[in-house]
Amino acid sequence: MVHGKAQKAQKDLRIVMCFVCLSVAIVLLAGCARVSLQEPPPAAQISAPGVDAAEPVTAAAPDGSFYVAWVSHDAKQADVMLAHFNDKGERQGAPVRVNRQAGAATAWRGDQPSLAVATDGSVYVGWTARFEAAGAHGTDIYLSASNDRGQSFASEVKVNDDKAPGDHGMHSLAVAKDGRIYVGWLDERNVQHPKPSDKAEGHHMESNRDLFLAYSTDGGRTFSANQKLASEVCPCCKTSLLVAPDGTLYAGWRQVLPGSFRHIAVASSKDGGTNFSSPVIVSDDRWMLQGCPVSGPSLALDPSSGSLRVLWYAAGDAGATGLYLSESKDNARSFSPRQLISEEVVHGTPALAAGTHNAIAVWQSAGAGETKMRDLGKEGSAASSVAANAELPAGVIANDHLYVAYIAKEKEQRSIWLVRASH
């Protein structure tokens, strides 16, 4: 009897031990699975090998996918390229050339293409083309439209309506829920350039520009008469456009104030871009600069409150040099005191990526050319590294993940890379 009880006890112990081992194995496997899911895939080159590629820009689509556009350079010729990615970051087909005539585009580090996706899935790309004729030269703004998810593009349409040659650039693009397309840019048609004799010896400085706007109500086939929104605008700082769900249009730019103070300004329109509110200076940064910082504002809506957020770089006397954030809850009539996001020198225009649940700032840190990010929805979050050797980043949130496109350099060769950043 005692021997039988001992055998039964040993059997029960073996069962318990097997159960414990199985439970531990399940926990370990689950832990490994969680680690695997949390670890983002490595960065991947998305531009063609051996091609000099730069100026990336991103845009989210309503179905959770996203697009990346960039510019491939070959001496004085350039092409705007577009690639489509699903909500897992997997590329859908080969990149497509946006401009119909090969080599017709132009771009530089401060003025990348503009990109937007409509609620019906139509893809719109804004870009600039250089022209030279009879001793005159300049750049024009064009819009290209695709109705098949970026697989092909119709013939581009010129947006600026002036006839005399001149520079048009630092453009931005936004599409409303009703399909109305807005394009903003800096324009020199009314600018009186100083004569060579009026310039200080050995000193070159761009004249300030006017901010212009045009809109299309027919899918980008035609555009309205060009409308001037502001004068004395910093000539080499990117503009920004944003349309809220209620149709309110916001425009942001860097205004040059008396004394050469260069501060961020925002105006809004409630009637489809016909009339705008008086521009409001977001923050008195006390940044006096005899030159252009090549850094404009980024606009986004707060995912929870719907308020307008502005992200920009400043190096003025009002505080630390760095990246700042401000918020408006009254349609850009007033702004909250600025919040320091990162105290450091920043290159280029920072990106403000907004998703359904969060907003993330992305920027290039000067010096080593490192791309950084900070989740603005997490209390007490700090800046973290996205990638080294990563310049002029563009960020987009898809499927609650942040994807960052950036320029990598190897010797003098540039290429476009895409990485899913953990957050």
Where are these regions (language model features)?
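Intrinsic disorder/low-complexity segments
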Residues: 1-36
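Extracellular, repeat-based ectodomains that mediate carbohydrate processing or recognition
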Residues: 33-423
